[in-house]
Amino acid sequence: MDMQADEMYRQDPLGSCGNPRQVSHITGRLSSLLGELPATWIEGEVTQLSPRRIGVFLTLKDMNESKHLEFFLPFDAFKDEVEVGNRVKIHGKLEFWATSGQIKVKGFEIQSVGIGELIERIARLRVQLALEGLYEHKRPLPFIPKLIGLVTGQNSDAEKDVVTNVLLRWPAAKFCTIYASMQGASCVSETISAIQKLDANNDVDVIIVARGGGSFHDLIGFSDEQMIRAVFAIKTPLISAIGHEADRPILDEVADLRASTPTDAAKRVVPDIADEKRLIKSAMSFLKKSYEPVIDKIKCDTLSWSQAFSNPFETFIAPRRREIDLFYQQMLTVVWANFSKTETEIAAIKKHLLAISPQNTLVRGYAMIEDETGRIISSADKLSAGDTVTLRLHDGLVRAEITQ
């Protein structure tokens, strides 16, 4: 930036419609501002590596974000061999490249992040997530999944192992497969996206993330904090089948089930149809042995009742004829006893009635005198000469007239 332009910028730093800044002024100012910043160490994953005649251009990406930054380093800045996918630290300074209009980092030194350092970071993250309780919540797997979600590399051995072994065990199984990078710069973002898409599918009731092992650097994405928290947040149970026994990724811890290999995942996600058939056959045999005697007895009883109801008289009445006759005799005895007792009581009452009956007195020669109205005359004072009376004898009536 020349002295005149610099003075103009100081007097009117924002510019105006009447006095706009030239592109060269802005780029020069930007370059000047960046030049004032100190050099710093920057860490990331190498996603692009382009050696040129003057040096090496490369791009670093964060593990947890999709942000990236471009670097330029001279050849003598490299002490170790660096490849795409490696995690590195670069000591450099921000610069504005006016010709391309980009901000890049001019690197002075590049170092590979050692495995020991990465292991230590992962160990700290593993403990932190454990303290937060991310490993405690385990979702149950369905006994027979309706639809298995599979996240794996396209045309990978892991995909073949899972699909082949699942179909061998349960031929009716169905898959919904989403391919993702199983290592490298895109591993975390693509795997998270695939898991979330499958979780949003209501037909998918279990998810398998499968990869056939690999080096520590290959599997580092499966210990990424963003991926672990994404898996914890889904509602669908998930099986981790990364297949690395020595250095298990943190995904194994947060998953609802850890499988040692993709083949092991296939054995865990569906039952073996041959085993289930044997169990059903065994159960049917047990039921047959347990209930066959009961069924035979029911058949026998049913036949007996059927025969009995075909001739109910011979079955129910004839065998009880003697009981009926005996009951009849007992009833007659009771009836006659009651009749005799009643007859005796009636005779006694009759005798008593006869003893006090006026008719019995008449038999002995007495007569009752009744006036013309039928009233009994019990005193001579009630009669007068000329009255007509009726004499009631034991065997009839006699009319008489009172003369005196």
Curated annotation (Swiss-Prot):
Its main location: cytoplasm. Its EC number is 3.1.11.6. One of its GO terms (cellular component) is exodeoxyribonuclease VII complex. It comes from the Bacteria. It catalyses: Exonucleolytic cleavage in either 5'- to 3'- or 3'- to 5'-direction to yield nucleoside 5'-phosphates. InterPro entries: Exonuc_VII_L (IPR003753), Exonuc_VII_lsu_C (IPR020579), OB-fold_nuc-bd_dom (IPR025824). It is found in: Cytoplasm. Keywords: Cytoplasm, Exonuclease, Hydrolase, Nuclease. GO terms for biological process: DNA catabolic process. Pfam families: Exonuc_VII_L, tRNA_anti_2. The keyword Heme does not apply. Belongs to the XseA family. This is Exodeoxyribonuclease 7 large subunit. It comes from Tropheryma whipplei (strain Twist).
